[in-house]
Amino acid sequence: MAVFEAKKQTKVTLDDTIPLKCLVDSAEKREDHMEYCVKVQRGPIPEHSWTVTKRYNEFVALDSDLKLSNIELQLPPKKVFGNFDREFIAERQQGLQTYLASVADHHLLSNSLYFKKFLDSTNYSINIPEQALQHVSMVFRSEKGWDVVEPLPDIGWRIRKSYILVKPVDQPKVRQVLSWCGFGPDKYIPEKELNAIMKLLPTIQHPNISPVVFSTTTESGGLAIRAFQEKGTLRDAVCKCKPKNHFLKKYANPKSCTTLDLNAVKIVGKQILEALKFLHEKGLPYGHLHAGNVIMDGGNCRLLDLENWLLGLPSYYRAFFTQFKKINTCELIDVYCFGQLLYEMAYGRQLFAPTCDSFPPNSPPEIRSVLESILSPEACKGGLPSVENLLSHPFFSGVSLPPSDKPVLKIPSKLKEAIKNAKEQMEKRLKEEQKIINQLKRLSKAKEFHMSEEEKKKRRKSKKSTPRKALQENGDISGESSSSKPSEPTKTSDSSSTQSSKKTLSQDSDRSEQ
């Protein structure tokens, strides 16, 4: 390799949205305490697994961290005496398994740093907020227009994204929010082109896209600065919470929620669809639509975080739509995410599931029709509508939006090509992951069918009938016509044949049970 040739990045960036599955496999006594062996698997591939050992006190510490979510998690109680009793250990092991499963099944709890670090301390040991401050300080050495006011820790769900309150040097009373995040697993745009595209974000003009004050990249990640919204996001409004609180406290199980009235849902929905249509026509994928990325400005809504896709970050709903091979383009991802957002606005709570096959009986038929076309199992498996299809739906087509200036987004052809190539790479990774998930699903269903009671009965019945057939073929069943008594050597031959048949049957039985 030439001395000055650029080195290719070979490090695979971890996708934090890939679910972690865990099994409390065994318990071992270590001097004065018990250790529980937990098998962990990242994603659907069994080879991506490892084992961690945990003491009961570590489970207690995890539970203490997760209490701010306001979710009742059933951690097995502490016991002072009889901790080494065999029955007690077996009962506690099962209780710990149930506890971890309940955390893993919750979309927000399973994506929290507490849970990830508990199961995978190797990949989650870095102090991410401190690292973010260092990167921001480096940027501010050359961009001297802002000062840091204070960090805003854990206000968002994304582990590797940090928010910092800043102020312009020439307007010290103004507050703006800076978001920093390292590159994600879907970062495919070369650094030179990426920085040029990030510089374009402040030039975007659209009534339903939040303006960016400043944006740039470094060799490690990217940042964007926007006006600070005192009232927070649409999700903050729905959950009636303070924007600066921890995201688990705000969103996991809010004490009280509110819905948008039907007319507001129509207007906000139409505005979001128009913004998505605009981005799609310009060739700029979004991919990060959810209530936490929407702000309300009077009766107008605006989308946040257009930079997420450019930086290669995985979507909030990625673990959901990877289960459906028909949701395989950036445009369809936006439609799916729109369905999740529409559900949250209409019912005042997150769906927290990939699909929905039962809606509240008092749902207005118009909105129910839209939701079923996106979130029903049949729609996710069969195909989703396009943004244009949704805009022509009666629920949105009758909405008239106020006139506004012509939207502006000019992307040079060279940068458009870089975005197009990155989009193809991102969709390729998505399809490969969906293919693996579907293959493993089919394998699991086949195994489940093979081990069903009905199939076991069929195999047992087949075992009983096979020896009789073998004997009939050898002429050993009484009533079979014979003109003379068989000679002694023939008996020996028949006996050997019967034993051989039974032996073969026994081997077949062993294989079938395996």
Segments (PLM) and residue ranges:
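Regulatory extensions appended to serine/threonine kinase catalytic cores
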Residues: 402-514
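Activation segment signature within eukaryotic-like protein kinase domains
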Residues: 268-269
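Short beta-strand micro-motifs within the conserved protein kinase catalytic domain, predominantly
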Residues: 211-222
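Conserved short submotifs of the Hanks-type protein kinase catalytic core
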Residues: 220-233, 237
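Catalytic-loop of the protein kinase fold
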Residues: 276-297, 303
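Phox homology (PX) phosphoinositide-binding domain
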Residues: 1-187, 488, 500-502, 506-514
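C-lobe/activation-segment region of protein kinase-like
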Residues: 302, 308-369
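Terminal C-lobe "cap" of eukaryotic-type protein kinase domains
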Residues: 377-404
